[in-house]
Every structure is written in C-alpha cells, then in structure tokens.
Amino acid sequence: MSLIQNPILRGFNADPSIIRVEDTYYIANSTFEWFPGVRLHESKELKNWNLLPSPLSTTTLLDMKGNPSSGGIWAPALSWADGQFWLVYTDVKVTEGAFKDMTNYLTTAKDIRGPWSDPIKLNGVGFDASLFHDDDGRKYIVQQTWDHREYHHPFDGITLTELDTNTLKLMPETARTIYRGTAVALVEGPHLYKLNGYYYLFAAQGGTVFTHQEVVARSKTLEADSFETEPGDVFLTNVDTPDSYIQKQGHGALVSTPEGEWYYASLCARPWNRPGESIYDPRGWSTLGRETSIQKVYWDDEGWPRIEGGHGGKTFVEGPKDAIFTESASDNSQQDDFTSPALDPNWNTLRVPFTAKMGTTGNGKLTLIGQGSLANTHDLSLIARRWQAFYFDAAVKVKFEPFSYQQMAGLTNYYNDRHWNFVFLTWNEINGKVIEVGENNRGKYTSYLKDNAIKVPDGVEYVWFRTKVRKQTYSYEYSFDGVTFTEIPVQLDAAVLSDDYVLQSYGGFFTGAFVGLAAVDYAGYGTQAEFYQFEYQELGDRLAADGSYSWEAGETRDK
C-alpha cells in the first residue's frame, strides 16, 4: 500500500461528499457562484483523482444569475441507492444579513457522467442538505436549519424530514430537530449513516475558519433530540494544532473500502504567513481556498469513530489495502489552444454558462465579447480556472483593439467581485493602446500605471501576458513577440485573494483564487477580444533554498 499525501484535491474543492460504488470512489464539492455547479472527481484508490463532468451544467438544473458572491451551490451531497446516483444541492440566493434565502434540490442519474434529471424542489429550511437512505426503504433529508429572528441563534440545529419515495416530495409534518450541536455552536453540514444498529450523525461546527471542527453523534432512533455527542475528544479539528500543515479540517463525509477500512474526506486549507507573521495569529492566508483532505478512521471499543493519529489528522495517510491504481496527471497544469467548440472542463464562468452572449471558442481561439467590469455580478465575459499550486505561471496571447478607456481585455487573478487584479489592454488619451494593471481591493479600485501605462507600439497586433504566482506575491509580465517578456514593476499581495483576508471585512466567503481571461466593455459597444494559446504551468508547492520547486510537504507548517 502507498501513502496518500494531503490534500488529495488541491485548490478550491470544499465541503467534500464522498461515496463508493463497487470499486470506485466519487467526491462531490461545492462550487458556490462558479458555473457549472458541483465539481466531481473519481478514483479507485483515494490517492489519485480524475475530474468528471459537472452535473449542474444547464440553467434548467442551476440558474444563478444575480446570485451574490459566495452564494450559489453550498455543500452538495452525493449518494447511491436503488441503482442510481442521487445528488442534493443548495442554491443560496441571499448571504448577507439576517436571511439566508435558499432552495434545496434533488436530481438523479444512472451514470455519474449524466444525464441528470430535471431538479425536484425540496425546501428552503436550511442549507447543507443531504439524503439518507435507511435500510427499511425510507428516505430522509437531513439539513442545517436557519432562523432569521435576531433574538434567536441563526443556526437552529439539524432537522430531519422524511421524503415520500413515490413523489420525491418532502413531508413537512415529519420534520423534527434531531441534534442541536455542542456549545461550540454553528452546527451544519450533516451526513447520516446507519452502522451496527446505530444512526451516526456527522456534522460540522465552529464556522468555516480556523475554529472549524467535525463532531459525531449517534442514536438508536431518529426521534427528536435523540442524538448523543461522541464523548471525549472531538472527531476532527485543527483549532488546537496551529503547527499542522493541514488546517481548517471538519466538514466532510465518511466512506468504507471494499475490505472494510474506513476513511473520512474533509475540507481543509494550507495557510501561509508573510515574513515576520506568527503562525498563531494570524493563523495565515489560504489563497488556494478550502481544499479536500482524507484521513483514516478507526472505531474505538465503544463503537465511536476516531481519526488515526489524533483529531488533528495527518498530512500523510496510509492508503487502502485493496487500492486499485488510478492513472492521473502528475499535477493540474493545463494548455488550451481553444480548438474545441466547448470549453475545457477546468474552465468556469460566473453564475451562468458560457454562451454566445459571452463569446465563442474553437478553431484555435477564444473570442470574448466585452460586457460589464469585473465588479459586475450580472453580465460579464470571464472564464477562469482555480489556483491549484502555490507556485505557477499562466500566460496567454491577446488581440484587442480598444478605442476607449472603458474597454479592457487581458489576464486576471480573481477572488470575487470586490477582490481581483487585472493586467489588460486598454486605451488612454496619451498613448492610445496601452497596458495597464488594475486592482479591486475591498471594493476600492486602483490603477497602478496611470499616465505611465505601457504603450503598445504601432503595428503590434498581438500582446502576450503572463502572471507569475509565487505563493505570497504575484506579478505580471508582457511581451510583444511571445519570446522576450518584460516584468511590470508591480508586486501584488496574494493574501488579498484569500478567504481569510476577505473575512476581515465581510461575512462568509469561501471560494479561493482563480486565474482567468476577461473582456470588458462597460461602454456597451460589445468590443471583442481574441485569446490564443493559454498555458497554466504548475511549478510546485514549495521553493527550496537553491531556487528549485517541489511538491514536498511535512506534517508541520513552514515557519
């Protein structure tokens, strides 16, 4: 057997729901406002994973137009029963303030690659809904419950509601609170299992930050308030292990191997610190977002699940004895020459699918039609992919003929509508077509070059842009021939593109950093930009003293 190195899914892959069907494991992850909805991977060994088509790929299944940043798909729950896959997902429409307006849906498929059935509306009681298939044939939705009343705690326990197996509609008269969590509060992310005569409830607590944790409770019945919390040590948390390489573990799901070994897939993060910062306060900046880790589980003498190595988990985990080798790429590097009429599955758009309104792809180029700015949450032409390594380069060739400063096209590093950076071609009154770098930081926009924007020489048709992400900082380069690149003298703080930074000023945000291509024409003339030869080249997660890169990791963080 081989060791599994965490995280098993690098970059923004939060809230894992893991299952096994025969000899194949599947993980579904949250995607929030990014389209298509729900990210799926498969493996036969838990170590190497391959990306599958996303199930929510049409507006029939998911319409997020107008959704706020970090709204959308929260904590999808994948299950297998009755010869088909079942997927429950939450579409959150309101994130700020007292209310969490949302709708939970159910879709099914015989094949994990689809087609998926039209969605069935379940309810809007709370988020993080999952489906439990009892061994007597009955089915239940278990979910967090939201209370908007300012004189109550908004997290109102875990509600269980029976699903009519004929109509696939919920029966609200059966709803009851089965668990209220512990004093840590903020109980959410429930998954229910029946094992050895007990119902085991796995639930997250403590919020989505460094205090995050997973608790386990169990009961002989599904009656109201019948679940007893696991005694002694909490199941999984890094709140008291600040030195650990893997942080923020908690929300996740349980799975068994064919040979009867047990594993737990969890969200996690790998924060880093700026020079001089303590790893204790602040705990760090997680620019890759919340990723997916896996930990091995054993059962104690009292029948409670425990994490091998203690509740903080480990970076390196013993793989299953019955693992079947899964071939996958050595990293997540991507080269896209845009020859296909459909976008590569690594690309994502915001809230809505890629359509002719945004542009076209194929025949060796991507054409984007300029729409709103990158601060727009309704109409914008942007495709982006996750940062999945601490050190990488990304480059693209661009053709664009702006005639106004309101028109921009280029390469962006993006977190959400209030936090992004952009190197782009535009126009100004001094030099005509120029290169500028702009940043939106907590909603405040800054032009870095201003009147010193770099003039594009007359007769130059194409400009190449490259971003060099170096864990704590990143920068941009340009070229007029695709061979010789010149660095733009602006060094940017990567922490600005992290959940942790955004949380200092706003409510919960959950998505991690992306690198992407965008065209803007907020003047409304639909100016088009052409993109060629995109390359995302991962270098590694660690920089050695000799300047070399590697994927090496340890059980403890770099100090």
State each model region's role.
Residues M1-K559:
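Carbohydrate-active catalytic/glycan-binding domains of CAZyme proteins
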